Amino acid sequence: MSSTDAEAKNEEAVDWEGPDDPENPRNWNQGAKMTHVLLVSSFTLYSNLAAVMFAPGAQDLVAEFGITSTIVASLTVSIYILGYVFGPFLLASMSEIYGRLIIYHICNAVYIAFTIGCALSTDTAMFLVFRFICGCAASAPMAIGGGTIADLHKPEERGKAMALFGLGPLLGPVIGPVVGGFVTQFLGWRWTFWLVLILAGVVSLLALVLMRETFEPVLLTRKAAELRKSTGNYRLQARTYNKDLTPAQLLARATIRPTKMLLMSPIVFLLSVYCAFMFGLTYLLFTTFPAVFEETYGFAADVSGLAYLGLGVGMIISIGLFAVLSDKLLHQPHGGTIARPELRLILMIWSSPLVPIGFFWYGWSAKYEVHWIVPILGTSVIGLGAFLILMPAQLYLVDAFGTEAAASALAANTVLRSLFGAVLPLAGPSLYDSLGLGWGNSLLAFIGLAFAPVPFFFYKYGERLRVRFPVNS
């Protein structure tokens, strides 16, 4: 290509009007950015609340619908999480073609409609189908929320935003059973869905009014279309436009990308497996709470859900630590070089031993029936460690793979995490029946310790591996 052709091509490429263009989402005022982060965080909160808020009422539904199979009874709760396995691949890829906003709005509408369906269900099949579709729709903010944060914030500004984004997936399962227990006792299991519906409806209406598109390629494409119309120059195209691929080919490529990243990138695969194991452990831990706190410590059924708050306290502490330290670590001078994404893993390296320590603490104190506050303190350590593993890993994926592939990287992470969250708890009863609380939790702790070197390995070799295994295309 000649220099003249190159200049002509540059003149026809539509871009932002300089680094300070107010239309660029990264240049929006802090109020607008925070509004979007809070709304996306609210999406994840109510979608994760719904995952387990119904659990205390599951036995009432089983009795009402005459369910006799233990597998089907378990599915009434876990099929929602299975929706998280199937939804992200399609939703993340569509967000990278059509933008984030339309995906949020469509999925919110679907979620609301099928939550009403769950509340009004009259038989098992109807309930399971509606709840699965709810799970698929609820996976949208989990899959593309990190992409929205990457659209809005430069890498060195993402720590606080990701801390807020991480509230939902981790605090939802903690608060859900507490609220669900009281709602089921006083209002019935159907009201767990009506309550989520009210919350989802309010947040969705606010999103319709306040949210705007944030994805750069979509915004530049719209800008180019307006300029073509106003100038009559039909050669104008967005800087991000790919003339070699049709929309169908772009969608196919974006749909394949999460799978490609999971299978071909050791970074995405190993970090996703590690996160999935940590996420699955927290759900598996929940299966022990009724036996430990109701049978061993004599908690009444209506207050046994308060035992979940130990995890919540640990997570709240970790949110503060993450928000304060994550971006500071990225700002530290490192030999005069530009901060690399691997610096996000420092918090993860420090925190890796905490979850195993928490499981040792919880398991053996519960086995020997030490005062009930002691195992709850152990779960606080688990909550602290789990958040400081999951959030640095997600933020690292966002920073390492950029705005255009962040949603795909997080979709791959969400799929594995949700799969482990749905399946691993099923192993809980047989594990603890065979080994007891002490050695059963110790086995999980030893597996957690085996994963501890993973973040250090990627801290040291991640940059080299990203070059060796490129998956952004």
UniProtKB/Swiss-Prot annotation:
| The family this protein is said to belong to | Belongs to the major facilitator superfamily.
State the name under which the record lists this protein.
MFS transporter prlG
Compositional bias (Basic and acidic residues) at which positions?
Answer: 1-12
Q: Where is this region: Disordered?
A: 1-27
Regions that span the bilayer? 37-57, 71-91, 101-121, 125-145, 163-183, 191-211, 266-286, 305-325, 345-365, 372-392, 409-429
Q: How does it sit in the membrane?
A: Multi-pass membrane protein
Known role: Efflux pump that might be required for efficient secretion of pyrrolocin or other secondary metabolies produced by the pyrrolocin gene cluster.
Q: Which organism is it from?
A: Fungal sp. (strain NRRL 50135)
Q: Name one GO cellular component term.
A: plasma membrane
Q: SUPFAM superfamilies recorded for this chain?
A: MFS general substrate transporter (SSF103473)
Q: Which GO terms describe its molecular function?
A: transmembrane transporter activity
Keyword list (alphabetical) reads: Cell membrane, Membrane, Transmembrane, Transmembrane helix, Transport
Composition bias of kind Acidic residues appears in 13-22
Subcellular localization, as worded in the UniProt entry: Cell membrane
Instruction: Tell me which domain of life the UniProt entry assigns to the organism this sequence originates from.
Output: Eukaryota
Q: Which InterPro entries match?
A: MFS, MFS_dom, MFS_trans_sf
